A protein has these predicted regions:
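Beta-strand-rich N-terminal accessory domains
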Residues: 1-67, 218-238, 245, 280-292
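Asparagine-centered strand-capping/turn motif at beta-strand->loop junctions
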Residues: 30, 151-157, 292
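Beta-strand-rich interaction surfaces with strong enrichment in secreted/lumenal proteins
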Residues: 58-59, 138-140, 273-278
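Beta-strand/loop-rich accessory regions of lumenal/periplasmic or secreted enzymes
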Residues: 61-96, 182-188, 197
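Extended, loop-rich substrate-binding clefts of extracytoplasmic carbohydrate-active enzymes
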Residues: 88-143
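Active-site/ligand-binding surface loops and adjacent short beta/alpha elements
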Residues: 160-162, 166-240
């Protein structure tokens, strides 16, 4: 499929194969494992996404940075709604199983203006052993001077499917102390660091301590850093804001002690009460747009 491509080739980084794209309008990288977009930088601009300098391209483990796909559950299984938990065999696996599985390239189209890539994965013996649903999952990347991602779930089983999910986007900043997020004002959120209490955001979000919150409402945010303003829009009604801060940074894999100062996450999600109930043979699409 890529034999005649002018802009895209497959490269191997340590143990993982990646699509490496060098287009006149942008450069990008997508790992075959997890269909994880790790880099996207329009020509003449700074990177849209943060990738850990300590990221490890290893089979069977998540990669720290870019946009990991969390599916069919977000976070730890035990913190998901009962409908999601009862459908899944008990596991310590966080963020589901598709982020560490190889996806296939289903479609590739390129032009002088943009590149469209569709990657996909379906149920297998390995997935059915964990999660008893037949499914098809595809991720459409539309890459140009902005970034669009669409994660489409189709329920191929005969019964209702419950799942949570997230496009776990990492964003860069040169100084977390001089970074704020607009768009969450007056939204309710669940504070995972304070006994999962529900609170209300009054002002813009400033990150000056560990933050792990799920916000509910319209997903339309602006990240203001010393360098630029980044717009993050999604059709979901739940978004996760995360920064590990000082102590947790020391415990995270593929993450240096000071990395919290140069990143933050806004994760477009369907989490907690926003989890998805999908009837048999129906589809659901989670959409994300990132621009400046």
């Amino acid at each position: 499929m890529l034999d005649k491509s002018v802009f895209c080739k497959i490269v191997t980084k340590d143990q993982l194969d990646c699509l490496q794209i060098n287009h006149p309008k942008f450069m990008a990288e997508i790992c075959i494992q997890g269909a994880q977009l790790t880099q996207f930088t329009p020509t003449g601009e700074q990177a849209y996404l943060w990738l850990s300098p300590d990221a490890e391209y290893q089979k069977g483990q998540g990669l720290r940075g870019g946009i990991p796909i969390c599916w069919p559950w977000f976070g730890g299984l035990s913190m998901n709604p009962d409908q999601v938990k009862t459908q899944t065999k008990p596991t310590e696996l966080a963020h589901g199983f598709v982020r560490t599985m190889d996806w296939s390239i289903r479609e590739y189209r390129e032009s002088a203006h943009e590149i469209n890539i569709v990657m996909g994965i379906s149920h297998s013996e390995a997935s059915l052993a964990i999660w008893p649903f037949e499914f098809d999952l595809s991720c459409h990347f539309k890459l140009s001077n902005t970034l669009n991602v669409e994660l489409k779930t189709t329920n191929l089983s005969s019964s209702n499917m419950y799942f949570s999910q997230a496009l776990h986007s990492y964003f860069p900043t040169s100084d977390i102390h001089n970074t704020k997020i607009l768009g969450a004002e007056k939204q309710n959120y669940v504070d995972a660091l304070d006994l999962w209490k529900t609170k209300q955001q009054v002002e813009s979000i400033a990150i000056n301590k560990e933050v792990d919150r799920i916000y509910f409402g319209k997903s339309d945010y602006r990240i203001l850093t010393p360098e630029h303003a980044t717009c993050v829009k999604s059709n979901s009604l739940s978004s996760v804001i995360w920064n590990p801060w000082i102590n947790k940074s020391k415990r995270l894999s593929q993450f240096s002690d000071n990395a919290y100062q140069s990143m933050l996450c806004i994760e477009s999600a369907n989490a907690l009460e926003d989890a998805v109930s999908l009837p048999s043979l129906k589809s659901h699409t989670l959409k994300l747009n990132i621009s400046r």
